[in-house]
Amino acid sequence: MTTEDDKGGRTATVSRWLPFSCVDGPGNRLVLFLQGCNFRCPGCHNPHTIGLCDHCGDCVPGCPSGALALIDGRVRWQASLCTHCDRCLDACPRSASPKTHQMSVAEVLVLLRRYGPLLTGITVSGGEATTQLPFVVALFAAIKAAPDLAHLTCLLDSNGSLGETGWQRLLPVLDGAMIDLKGWRESVHHSLTGQGRERVLASLQLLARAGKLAELRLLQVPGRSDFLDAGGGLDAGLTDFLQTLGPVPIRLNGFRHHGVRGEAMGWQEAAMEELDRLSNALKVKGFGPVSLPPL
């Protein structure tokens, strides 16, 4: 959750952060992973970022290193004792983590200044970053207002569920958004995310009109995705929709078992041949550039 700290600065619940990444947008980027997500994707590869800790304490007894304790009704994590065995993540009934922490806008700016000479920009991801929208807006605004940081691009990695009012708050300080589309037909999208597709499609069109759709990401799940028709060509409805976006980079992601739980462990992993077919179908219709993952 996003809160105001006692100095009036925005804070957010953060799962973790990376000082350098070359896979979360162009260039070398600092990545902030915010906790909490409003989708329930069976194939999520970071399921421990979905929920928020309610301090039930279920994770405490199973910690082999004694890094967790229930003190005054709150779970406390001692990083110096933690071996990162992740048993606490498996024990959590809320798909949360006891290892999250609060970070303020000011603290993120300190990190950006520390690593700034080596950075192209910052990407805020999740979970779902827009569930903590006030923090993201405040952070990006602070970066744009700081002369020594203004050269850094501010990108968002999102599921596209934010409504138009929220996007209008964010657009003035946003350089671009990378949006996931995990299914085309309503029924398929719902089965893969737990939510409908309407807001995602609206977000894609809004960002495209604003010139801030940095990347469209399509997830290919064998036997479940519906981007291709029965003949192996691009679905006609998807073709019509993509034409409304104009030129946009497309990244294909193939489903993998890494990190997933439950029923999705029984799903087939995507082979490169399947991604090649989708890539070729997109290119035949003139969409792209299309990039493939290093499976």
Label for each model-derived stretch:
Residues 2-26, 220-295:
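Auxiliary Fe-S-binding modules of radical SAM enzymes
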Residues 14-58, 75-84:
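N-terminal pre-triad scaffold of radical SAM enzymes
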Residues 66-72, 81-92, 110-128:
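Short Fe-S-cluster ligation motifs
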Residues 64, 93, 113, 205, ...:
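Class I S-adenosyl-L-methionine
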Residues 106-266:
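Conserved AdoMet/S-adenosylmethionine-binding subsite of the radical SAM
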Residues 101, 193-196, 271:
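Short, conserved glycine- and acidic-residue-centered signature motifs
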Residues 42-52, 58-76, 87-102:
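Iron-sulfur cluster-binding cysteine motifs and their immediate structural context
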